[in-house]
Amino acid sequence: MEAAMNNHDGDCCKSGPGYATPLLAMSGPREKLIYVAAIYTGTGQAKPDYLATVDVEPSSSTYSSVIHRLPMPYLEDELHHSGWNSCSSCYGDSSCERRYLILPSLLSGRIYVIDTKTNPREPSLHKFVDPAEVLEKTGLAYPHQPHCLASGDVLVSCLGDEDGNAEGSGFLLLDSEFNIKGRWEKDGNSPLYGYDFWYQPRHKTMISTSWGAPAAFTKGFDLKDVSDGLYGKHLHVYSWPQGELKQILDLGDTGLLPLEVRFLHEPDKATGFAGCALSSTLVRFFKNDDETWSHEVAISVEPLKVENWILPEMPGLITDFLISLDDRFLYCSNWLHGDIRQYNIEDPKTPVLTGQIHVGGLVQKGSLVLALGEEGKAFQFDVPKIKGQRLRGGPQMFQLSLDGKRLYVTNSLFSVWDRQFYPELVEKGSHMLQIDVDTDKGGLSINPNFFVDFGTEPDGPSLAHEMRYPGGDCTSDIWV
């Protein structure tokens, strides 16, 4: 991955960062390092969040361990998602390089810029964008998802105003030096709610999703807040790069809390998916002949009838998904049920389940919660121990190797929600797993030799969230 970062990766070494096509990216070098956002915010420990560097090179003496920790200079940040200053969208520009990891803090509003180029094994803080300046110039707060643009600018979704109102959501545009340029969207074209976004330049479109009002989700999840309209069920279709809101797709009850959104990687394709957490659906969106966009439910995870839980039925809660670089497979996490699913999406209209594995969840054997079968017979899922450790929480964030053969998994969603649904996760910390993927016939299996225990960190148990490779990946790089 260091070779990729330095643009010495075979076919991609003659131009800008990344790869010319998604398929060329699949032939990139195997990952050796992975950066993980690690969180102390909300755990009761007065320690700063940090960026953990994990060794994922099997031949290394420090394989499957944290080899470096970069603490942030402030407390109570809540690191969450991340992105790059430049990626494959800048492939045609030799003046660009993938050097800085952009780390927004969901609660404090600080946007950290991390230098990963000087020493990839020991990243350092380059600067941070002051939330007071962002607020003064744009009115935006709660920064969430950054994406690099072909222009060299960085676009960051923001989820509300300083009071946590969703009406204040929008998109922050930073220049290549991380100075504030302003809002990206045109005046009066802000989304109803904010969260994730993905753009497909050949179709002159960006689509963004809807978590909810920060004033609601930062207090924990309350089902009443959904009925009170404090959570989203919409996809926002923008003209790219003009920033005009062209359409709002109302997903209804089959699309509650749409979080992650991904177009297919092939830039000519005018379709993609959004993962809707509460409805536990993958909604496919697609362009019509008249240039408008429509949607349909492509995947639906049925709720479990349960005993000894807060509700009689438990949703899967799809909190993350990703798509392999060849657009063959989609992987999604059911954070509450505890399983990871692999679908063949060669025909995006009709995904086929090809793999499933349980790596935690509220219904694993030994837990208090029981699932009920069709005839009312109680059951629980078998979840293996890894290196003698019982798996805590449920599968949450993913990262897939470039070749599609290794899926990395962490288990923290958001510290307040972790404490609400998985208190043991806050007490004992997260862990990181690696799933081996059969890319021929389909199928998933746990790598028993890989287990990173964030419960044994020097400053106490921490929560592990999003992951990034130094050389880019299938959830950061966009092809133009």
UniProtKB/Swiss-Prot annotation:
GO molecular function, one term: selenium binding
Pfam families: SBP56
Known tissue expression: Expressed in young seedlings, mostly in roots.
Record keywords: Selenium
Induction details: Slightly induced in roots by cadmium.
Annotated family: Belongs to the selenium-binding protein family.
Name of the protein described by the UniProt record: Selenium-binding protein 3
Gene responsible for this protein: SBP3
